[in-house]
Amino acid sequence: MSEFQVRPDWMAFCLPDISEAEVQADADVIRSGWWAKGPRTMEFQKKFAEYVGAKHCIAVNSCTAALHLALLTQGIGPGDEVITTPLTFASTANTILHVGATPVFADIDPDTGLIDPAEIEKKITGKTRAVVPVHYSGLAADLGAIGRICDEHNLFLSEDAAHAVETRYNGELIGHHPRGTVSYSFYATKNLACGEGGALVTDDDDIAKKAQVLSCHGMSAGAWNRYGKEGSWRYDIEEPGYKYNMFDIQAALALTQLSRMEDMQRRRFEAVEVYQQAFADVPELRLQKTPDYCHHSRHLYVLRIVPERLTISRDQFIEELKARNVGVSVHFIALHTMSAYAKRFGYKPEDFPKAYAFSESEISLPLYSTLGVQNAEYVADAVLDVVKTYRK
């Protein structure tokens, strides 16, 4: 291998894929004068539901909002427990706390980073009301096993699909005729992005109606159109709700991204293939495994170092990549080690040893549809140069 040459410019960890179509779509909305929740939001709800194969879609301003609404529709609250994973972003656990319930963590499968169904079963008590599995990095959680557990114990299933646009379980998109609810993120870094945004999908009419009302102050259905010719100024507040709705500027971006999904995914997978080939036979690195039931959407490229084979730590490895002008991230710092949860529940790192070990060795490499093969090759070479420099 020739000597590694550091590029002069910084390579961002993630960048949104913005074409002229997105610019034009938002310009059209801005010129229309209808910027808030309106016809474009309604169109997106219809098209996204059709895309994933669900009966209902409620477009909201974040996946956090969707996760919160999912629990609210079930009346989950104080005294209840909800099982989830410690290897996730804070919103998964925070929304459980926001309804007054207690998040109960179950450890992961270290090969995938996904919540382990066997660990879920160990955590079930008489207070357990729901399970919130996370489709981590674009891998599908084992919905067959988790669904059976939920059926056996009469538990609500709220899927956190923040990473899972284009993820498939047994050939079907996540969200296809869901057992309970599925919550998505359209944050700027996601496979489908609109800056900030999210969606809740369900096949349940009652859940959909309640979530729709709660997402916009508790206003009665149709209130979004109260300024239109066919609308009515009269509305009711059915129950105190939240300001969670998506608006048309976001929806226009989301619709355009949805129409470009196939091409964006194709280019994302070209970069993944570079990484997979480069790291396949490197004993200092551990690649994420994909279960047979799953089609990985590749929201993240998850790489783990093998600490005992290197003379530097994961944190030092990241600094070495930064010195080579490669931006990376970590997904995630295990929640049970965060002060908000450790202090409240008395957690220690070793309470969830697999999640902790995963968290302490993981590095997320740059991955986005505009990355390109050449840039992916540079990232791979940078990683291999660090390994070569610091292997034992």
State where each predicted segment sits.
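Conserved active-site segment immediately N-terminal to the catalytic lysine
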Residues: 159-194, 233-238
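PLP-dependent aminotransferase class I/II
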Residues: 42-46, 54-57, 118, 130-134, ...
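Structural detector of well-ordered beta-strand residues that form the stable sheet scaffold
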Residues: 58, 83, 104, 156-158, ...
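Active-site PLP attachment segment
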Residues: 177-221, 248
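A short alpha/beta connector and helix-capping loop motif
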Residues: 114-123, 171-181, 383-385
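Phosphate-binding glycine-rich loop
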Residues: 34-81, 95-99, 105-107, 172
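PLP-dependent aminotransferase-like
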Residues: 72-164, 168
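N-terminal "arm"/small-domain region of PLP-dependent enzymes with the aminotransferase-like
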Residues: 1-34, 39, 236-238, 366
